[in-house]
Amino acid sequence: MFKLKNKKMLKKIIIVIIIVGAIGGAYGLYVFFMPHRDVQSVEAFATISANDLVAEYLKDNAAANLKYLADDGDSKVLNITGRVSSIETDQKNQLVLILKDEGAAIGVSCTFMESTNKNAKKLKVGDVVKIKGVLRSGVDEDSEMLEEDVIIENCDVLS
């Protein structure tokens, strides 16, 4: 009788695990296939210069993160103006522009999408541009006092 009870309990536990796994898998697929936000069609939260955005982060990183970043992944869409200091291509063949004034230690890194690369290819170092994108990371200071640029993704050139 004792063995029979254990088999029934084991069967119930296995059924519960399968049900929970199926629900978790279904939710994972739902999130994976959910449409991504079209950054270019969303109204910008603010228009700000690259220098002012960097200065805001250097002044109070926590306050700037509260203002621009969101835990749910829907961080603020910004229009950023600044001078192009470098143009690079990342591993995904996406253009990455750095907006900062000459002599500035840090700036704003703007990563374009494959579909918007063509709009950024006409830009040259020294051009003053207005770019729309979503903020992903503020100024990052590590323990060695190295600072990373503010990171903007899904960018496109406005002017």
PLM region descriptions:
Residues 2-159:
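OB-fold and OB-like single-stranded nucleic-acid-recognition modules
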